[in-house]
Amino acid sequence: MRGNDMRKLLDALYEYAAYAAALFMIGTLVAVLAGIVDRYLNLGVRGTDMYAGYCMAAAGFLALAHTLKNGEHIRVSLILQKLHAVAKHRLEVWALFAATALAALFAAFSVKLAYNSWQFHDISTGNDATPLWIPQTAMAIGTVILLIAFVDELVLEIKGRRVEKTSDEALHNE
């Protein structure tokens, strides 16, 4: 696979994960609305609060990589702005390596958690009795995609090809 094809594949992965996150946000809205309607009409719909939580968690984890790649994560760049190019590059490599290592641990834990929940038939304690591996799988997928994004950023920084994206949002002082 050529580099350009790999870039397109990775960008598509981050983009589709963001689309999935958006769908889960809609799922959160639907679950909350269903719970509200159920309280007024007493329809007997069970577990809407739990499903809203599952959808919200899935949305958050699936959006992590896209957020990282678009420069939307919180960063302390005051030190980086003061450094010369070589020192800045070294600090960026160190920070990205540390973040990649943490993301790898997080992904490994998330995958193991979902697998163990599936293996031991773990279910939620709510009245919905959902097998926990189902919502945990979204977390595992999101953390694995985040790990891929950090490896991508690290490799780009080492090769000197990383383009730092910054948020278009204006700085806020409160």
Predicted feature descriptions by range:
Residues 1-174:
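Alpha-helical transmembrane segments and membrane-interface helix-loop junctions
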